[in-house]
Amino acid sequence: MKIAIITGANSGLGYASTQALLNEGYYIYMACRSEEKAVEAINSFDLQFRDKVEYVHCDLSSFDSIRACADHILKNEKQLNALMLNAGLMATPPGETKEGYEMQIGVNVLGHALLADLLLPLIKTTPDARVICLSSV
């Protein structure tokens, strides 16, 4: 079974991508900030898919949360076929990440860069693995 991680998988393009990859036979890790929203999304999938999707907490504004997410994947998987870097913020009120970076840059760029870097060893050992980055401009 192919394995994918999708950030921001509980809504929008992340949710649609989760549905599409479930239909293709993937096991999906929904890397989301809100467990409540992720569980709501999981419960909306057909019953046949609910055992092929798992919520994993990933707050992209916190390097500690990103590291914990990556550690969970690295401890539980021997391959990673797709990493979809989808989550993002736009037009947010002024604020900073836990590490002191401007929130939008911290989440949309630095958080995803750290997650990809931490998962790169697993991606590199998986034949035909893909990293997909989504962005709005």
Range-by-range predicted roles:
Residues 49-53, 72-85, 91-96:
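A glycine-rich helix->loop->beta "capping" turn
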Residues 35, 56-71:
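The beta1-alpha1 cofactor-binding region of Rossmann-like NAD(H)/NADP(H)-dependent oxidoreductases
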Residues 24-40:
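Conserved glycine-rich Rossmann-like NAD(P)H-binding loop of the short-chain dehydrogenase/reductase
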Residues 76-77, 93-95, 118-127:
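A short helix-coil junction within the Rossmann-fold of NAD(P)-dependent oxidoreductases
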Residues 8-12:
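Conserved glycine-rich cofactor-binding loop
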Residues 92-106:
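Short alpha-helical oligomerization interface
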Residues 7, 80-88, 133-136:
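Rossmann-fold scaffold of SDR-type NAD(P)-dependent oxidoreductases
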